[in-house]
Amino acid sequence: MKHFSVKACAKINLGLLITSRRDDGYHTLETIFAPIEWHDTLEFTESDKIGMECTNLDLPVDDTNLCIRAAKALQDYAGISKGVSMKLVKRVPFGAGLGGGSSDAAATLNALCRLWEIDVPSAVLHRLAVKLGADVPYFLEMKGLAYASGIGEELEDLSLALPWHVVTVFPEVQVPTAWAYKNFHRQFERPVPDLKALVRRLCDDRDLSVLDAFENDFGSVVFENYPVVSQVRDTLEASGAQFVSLSGSGSAVYALFENRALADETAEEMAGKFRVNVTPAGFRME
């Protein structure tokens, strides 16, 4: 009986600029995705049906779960009746803007191609991923920094890794994505900076002067309405970090540090109140 486990890493957004609202209600955006070491573990075992258990009992394991949906979508595409027993060891907070559920779904697609021994064209996997969630393709296809546009599904591999240590803090509150999109302050008419060029200057040249361009359009409304998220931001800004930002629509906040010892010290101080992760400089997903 085949059995193996895989990691499903989270992400942060370096800048998140919402550029328009489409007729179908979705918003277009530009962002830089960067992976962080904070990860879930998924275990896959051959079975005669699709089933799942999770270490976090607050997460449903029915057809609303992205891993179950990913497995059934792949099963339907391949026209097979094989099953899988999945166990999700959940570490990445949900409702945090870290893409944990999307990463789990992407890991499921990749793992089941291996477990079920099916050869699925990359274009088909991409389409299945987009149907599951706009940022699922990032976790499916990329290892390091990527530029994303459209609704987040149009990707360009930048072949870069962040040269800073990343401290990511979950303030123990969830920000509903739908609420964030309904309430953010629209700036559709503003000129959009060239995020790809700026992130190359940031990573290749260590040009810290470009950091102010990496705004997150959800930041102001989330900080205004969630005092604990604002508190986490203020603490990180006072710690000596080079840059502090909301990730996605929140609630997680991250900080970039040049000095690993300072990153570890800051994380240790905050770990008494919040869940915290430190990702080393140069990190890429496996």
UniProtKB/Swiss-Prot annotation:
Pathway: Isoprenoid biosynthesis; isopentenyl diphosphate biosynthesis via DXP pathway; isopentenyl diphosphate from 1-deoxy-D-xylulose 5-phosphate: step 3/6. The keyword Cytoplasm does not apply. It is an enzyme of class 2 (transferase). Gene3D superfamilies: 3.30.230.10, GHMP kinase, C-terminal domain (3.30.70.890). ATP binds at residues 93-103. GO terms for molecular function: 4-(cytidine 5'-diphospho)-2-C-methyl-D-erythritol kinase activity; ATP binding. It catalyses: 4-CDP-2-C-methyl-D-erythritol + ATP = 4-CDP-2-C-methyl-D-erythritol 2-phosphate + ADP + H(+). Keywords: ATP-binding, Isoprene biosynthesis, Kinase, Nucleotide-binding, Transferase. The keyword Lyase does not apply. Its EC number is 2.7.1.148. GO terms for biological process: isopentenyl diphosphate biosynthetic process, methylerythritol 4-phosphate pathway; terpenoid biosynthetic process. It comes from the Bacteria. It holds the Pfam family GHMP_kinases_N. The active site is at residues 11, 135. Catalyzes the phosphorylation of the position 2 hydroxy group of 4-diphosphocytidyl-2C-methyl-D-erythritol. Belongs to the GHMP kinase family. IspE subfamily. This is 4-diphosphocytidyl-2-C-methyl-D-erythritol kinase. The gene is ispE.
